[in-house]
């Protein structure tokens, strides 16, 4: 009768050693990740996967590996890692959010929308998913659904600047220009030092051919954030509308030097 008992004790001891080793590797991998030692962190996480390939928490390790691959620009590998993680645990919200964000980055809006919707099916008040799904609905001109998501988000977080800014942009697109401007005026009062608000409002003034008001807002945004390439993109567009070609070109070149996408500045 002693042999089965001894075997059970040996099994329990091995299991404890394995679990301890797994936890040590995960902790080390996270420390390496925080120190930006990406290659070492990935190797450590993969070693942890080898120690215990069946544990459900491996879903998070695949998330970390995917994050590392994404930072290296290995987008397809990152998507594959997220997929494996979701195969292990299909309801891990952080994994779904990572994949949704990467799909959005790769302009695969349909799959990004599907992942954000799945997150909201699991957690209806998940604020990141609400914001980006509202953005995607706006891009698809599904203003009714976009408004529902933005309204829900603003109710959850009344001081969420990005949500309120998104709602103002939506109202402008949805032929509610007065409401949009009122919302932007309110945001400028609440967040007077945030350049993004003045850039959006300046853009709306520009679309209405209210050039002096547009220039005032854009110039103020530049004062607030002189290294923000979006400021010079906006002023370049203003100068184009005013037929000041040399000034428009100079601002376009400066925006590119600061990191703007050149495709946004084509004639």
Region spans (language model):
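Canonical tetratricopeptide repeat
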Residues: 27, 60-64, 98, 132, ...
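Short coil turns that delineate tetratricopeptide repeat
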Residues: 53-56, 90, 124, 158, ...
């Amino acid at each position: 009768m002693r042999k089965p008992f001894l075997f059970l004790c040996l099994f329990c001891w091995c299991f404890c050693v394995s679990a301890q080793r797994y936890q040590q590797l995960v902790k080390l991998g996270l420390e390496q990740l925080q120190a930006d030692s990406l290659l070492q962190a990935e190797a450590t996480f993969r070693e942890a996967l080898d120690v215990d390939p069946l544990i459900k928490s491996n879903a998070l390790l695949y998330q970390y590996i995917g994050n590392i691959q994404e930072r290296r620009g290995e987008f397809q590998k990152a998507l594959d890692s997220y997929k494996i993680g979701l195969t292990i645990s299909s309801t891990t919200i952080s994994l779904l959010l990572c994949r949704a964000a990467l799909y959005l980055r790769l302009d695969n809006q349909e799959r990004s929308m599907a992942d954000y919707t799945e997150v909201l099916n699991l957690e209806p008040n998940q604020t990141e998913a609400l914001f980006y799904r509202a953005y995607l609905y706006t891009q698809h001109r599904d203003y009714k659904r976009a408004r529902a998501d933005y309204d829900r988000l603003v109710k959850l977080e009344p001081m969420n600047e990005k949500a309120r800014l998104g709602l103002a942009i939506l109202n402008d697109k949805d032929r509610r220009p007065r409401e949009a401007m009122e919302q932007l005026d309110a945001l400028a009062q609440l967040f007077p030092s945030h350049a993004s608000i003045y850039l959006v409002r300046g853009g709306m003034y520009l679309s209405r051919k209210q050039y002096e008001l547009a220039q005032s807002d854009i110039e103020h945004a530049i004062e607030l954030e002189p290294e923000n390439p979006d400021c010079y993109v906006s002023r370049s567009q203003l100068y184009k509308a005013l037929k000041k070609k040399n000034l428009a070109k100079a601002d376009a070149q400066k925006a590119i030097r600061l990191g703007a996408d050149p495709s946004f500045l084509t004639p």
